[in-house]
């Protein structure tokens, strides 16, 4: 049975249409017209316990609205949601015990309290047994390297330190599900990798279900096997990350290091870009040829010292889908 399930989920907002100037504002007091803005339309998906799912889309696509409905903050206009067997907006308190939330741009820590006291306060709010609290906190302090700033007021922490504290705070009560909204925004490379390693650890060690919304697709590639793409409030793709790469990442680049510079290097039917001599880059469509066949053609004409295959970036693939919409490409035919 899925731990999260949505059926025909829809959320719209009404706003008053006002005319211009003072007259328009006064007129709206007596005769109101409304316009409806649909944020989420007919969203259907289910998530099994223990999955790590990337929920991604451009700004304004409906990601945050969906997360707010899953957490019980917003009530759907129509459709149904179940999270761990509960309807979130009907059972908000029980739902809150089942979930943890980390927002990259907002903190649940108490600004004026030292980090340790913030954790103690959250323990009391969630009524976490003291033995379990100590066990969880000891593990988080070790894996997130929190010890050196546990006595520091939250307002004095760096962004990276605060984010690590927020992750510990979100997981102290052993939630079944964690919603992560831009968890690595603004962090440096080292801090990002520490956060990614922590997410992978809690998923593997505790079986925590993770829903990740982010614009940093390196987070998605590092953590998720499955992604849900949403655009203009509608799910346009739901499936494995590798399937998306296979369907849309059709163009690869073969980087060839020649034994000697070849300024007139050419290969019929292949886009050639000259790099720092003696390197050339060959862009090819793997639906019509293979890297092996291309290497064979090159070695028949030139002496080479090294080759490497560069796969398309996931960011480029997703950008293309946003611009063109998702359509499953036809099956590829490859050269022998």
Task: Tell me the role of every PLM-derived stretch.
Residues 9, 21-29, 120, 124, ...:
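Conserved ABC ATPase "signature" region
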Residues 153-157:
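Conserved ABC ATPase signature
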Residues 178-182:
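Catalytic Walker B motif of ABC-type/P-loop ATPase nucleotide-binding domains
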Residues 196-285:
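ABC transporter nucleotide-binding domain
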Residues 253-324:
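Short, charged/small-residue-rich alpha-helical element at the C-terminal edge
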């Amino acid at each position: 049975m899925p731990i999260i399930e949505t059926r025909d989920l829809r959320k719209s907002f009404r706003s008053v249409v006002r005319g211009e100037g003072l007259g328009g504002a006064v007129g709206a007091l007596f005769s109101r017209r409304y316009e409806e803005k649909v944020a989420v339309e007919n969203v259907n998906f289910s998530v099994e316990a223990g999955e790590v799912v990337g929920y991604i889309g451009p700004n304004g696509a409906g990601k945050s609205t969906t997360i707010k409905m899953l957490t019980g903050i917003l009530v759907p206009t129509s459709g149904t949601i179940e999270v761990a067997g509960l309807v979130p907006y009907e059972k908000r308190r029980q739902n809150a015990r089942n979930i943890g939330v980390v927002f990259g741009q907002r903190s649940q820590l108490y600004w004026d309290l030292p980090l340790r006291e913030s954790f103690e306060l959250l323990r009391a709010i969630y009524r976490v047994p003291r033995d379990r609290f100590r066990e969880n906190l000891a593990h988080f302090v070790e894996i997130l390297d929190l010890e050196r700033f546990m006595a520091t007021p939250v307002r004095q922490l760096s962004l990276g330190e605060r984010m690590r504290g927020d992750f510990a705070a979100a997981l102290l009560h052993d939630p079944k599900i964690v919603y992560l909204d831009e968890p690595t925004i603004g962090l440096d490379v080292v801090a990002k990798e520490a956060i990614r390693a922590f997410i992978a650890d809690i998923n593997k060690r505790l079986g925590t279900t993770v829903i990740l919304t982010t614009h940093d697709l390196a987070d998605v590639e590092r953590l998720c096997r499955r992604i849900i793409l949403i655009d203009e409030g509608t799910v346009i793709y739901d499936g494995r990350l590798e399937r998306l790469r296979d369907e849309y990442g059709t163009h690869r680049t073969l980087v060839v290091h020649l034994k000697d510079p070849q300024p007139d290097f050419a290969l019929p039917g292949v886009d050639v870009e000259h790099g720092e001599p003696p390197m050339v880059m060959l862009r090819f469509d793997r639906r019509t040829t293979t890297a092996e066949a291309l290497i064979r053609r090159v070695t028949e004409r030139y002496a080479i010292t090294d080759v490497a295959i560069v796969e398309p970036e996931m960011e480029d693939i997703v950008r293309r889908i946003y611009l063109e919409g998702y359509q499953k490409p036809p099956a590829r035919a490859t050269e022998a």
